[in-house]
């Protein structure tokens, strides 16, 4: 039974990607738990810039493969060690183990994807490199066993609401 559950947890289904640079797609399966305007993350030097942020909580039953919300170039990847609070809590963004991907989209906008480890998830896997060119929906990594993904973006308007279910690579998060 454990073997079946592990196989289910680490599944990596193919997804139908829109492939339209005027939209951002969800980087993760899960529930939208926040849609807000915030300062950019200081970890990637954008704390003096305003962004919209969407947070997606992945429970242990969601697929944990993460994808890029847009086509573009990975300008930076930054790993921050940290604690392992429940990923749905606000303090998880600042205190939990996390990995930042700073992506320059095809329109020249900064898009930041943050993988945040949670109470059970204690391993972030990065499958991309700095300066790598990505297509919308490409796999960038995974977080094992329950976690969160935050997307910071500029110059797009949100299309999702808190409580909505998101599917990685398919759900349209925001529109140009």
Q: What are the residue ranges of the model-derived segments?
A:
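Contiguous, well-folded functional domains in the mature portion of proteins
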Residues: 1-176
């Amino acid at each position: 039974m454990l073997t079946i559950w592990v196989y289910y947890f680490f599944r990596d289904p193919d997804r139908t990607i829109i492939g339209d640079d005027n939209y951002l797609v969800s980087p993760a399966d899960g529930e939208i738990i926040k849609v807000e305007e915030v300062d950019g993350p200081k970890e990637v030097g954008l704390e003096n810039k305003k962004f919209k942020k969407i947070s997606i909580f992945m429970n242990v039953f969601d697929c944990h493969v993460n994808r890029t919300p847009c086509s573009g170039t990975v300008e930076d990847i930054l790993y921050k060690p940290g604690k392992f609070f429940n990923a749905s809590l606000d303090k998880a963004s600042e205190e939990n183990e996390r990995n930042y991907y700073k992506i320059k989209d095809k329109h020249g906008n900064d898009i930041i994807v943050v993988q945040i480890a949670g109470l059970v998830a204690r391993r972030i896997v990065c499958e991309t490199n700095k300066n790598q060119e990505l297509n919308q929906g490409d796999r960038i990594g995974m977080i094992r066993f329950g976690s969160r993904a935050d997307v910071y973006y500029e110059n797009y308007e949100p299309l999702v609401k808190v409580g909505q279910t998101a599917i990685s690579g398919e759900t349209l998060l925001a529109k140009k």
